[in-house]
Regions:
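Hydrophobic core positions in small helical hairpin nucleic-acid-binding modules
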Residues: 1-206
């Protein structure tokens, strides 16, 4: 989380400049964002890539409709198993001792944000789970409003595993040195949670 910004954001930063390229699927979706070959721009200069994530509560799937026969491999939706694996890691990490972290945002302010935003309540149920098996979508878009990836939310609340799974999936398709700013309306809460657990692979800077 870049706490100096007025817009909640999470920054997942690498260190040095590399010459490489993004996965072709990203280049096809937005050449302006992902068509470059030079990565490692400092965050003070804006980083390399800007994306945003949020939940949409108006896209639901009725349980009674069932599942259609599988006839293609979805390229926009990440698998439920991938999301659940991230959730299992988060649950496991929360049982570890908290890491020491220094946040630029006081805990009191973050607590007020958590109390005032429905999206920050991971247990808030906004659709009847007995009627819908997928109650909303979590999405990741680039700075040009182009959808990159989606995840079906299949439980009450906008739990953190959905946004983190999308971010992890994005980074699996980027050069290892890419610096990315992730905007999220409750990013301050997500950043505090991540600062208290151990997360593998790349490091989050807040």
């Amino acid at each position: 989380m870049d706490s100096s910004s007025s817009t909640p954001s999470t920054v997942w930063q690498q260190e040095s400049l590399s010459q490489s390229s993004c996965a072709e699927i990203l280049v096809q979706r937005c050449p302006a964002c992902f068509g470059g070959i030079s990565f490692g721009r400092p965050l003070d200069d804006g980083g390399d890539i800007h994306v945003a994530t949020d939940g949409n509560f108006h896209h639901r799937h009725r349980r009674s409709a069932g599942d259609c026969p599988s006839f293609y491999e979805p390229s926009y939706f990440i698998p439920k198993a991938q999301v659940d694996a991230v959730g299992c890691h988060i649950d496991h990490a929360r049982h570890h001792p908290s890491k020491s972290s220094q946040s630029g945002v006081p805990d009191e302010a973050i607590d007020q944000c958590e109390a005032s935003y429905e999206a920050a309540d991971g247990q808030k149920q906004k659709a009847a789970m007995d009627n819908f098996d997928d109650t909303r979508l979590m999405m990741l878009i680039c700075r040009h409003d182009i959808p990159l990836f989606f995840a079906n939310i299949d439980m009450p609340g906008e739990q953190q595993k959905f946004s983190i799974a999308l971010i992890c999936h994005l980074f699996s398709l980027l050069p290892s040195q890419a610096n990315v700013v992730v905007l999220y309306d409750v990013g301050c809460i997500l950043a505090r949670s991540l600062s208290r657990v151990s997360f593998p692979a790349r490091s989050f800077l807040f």
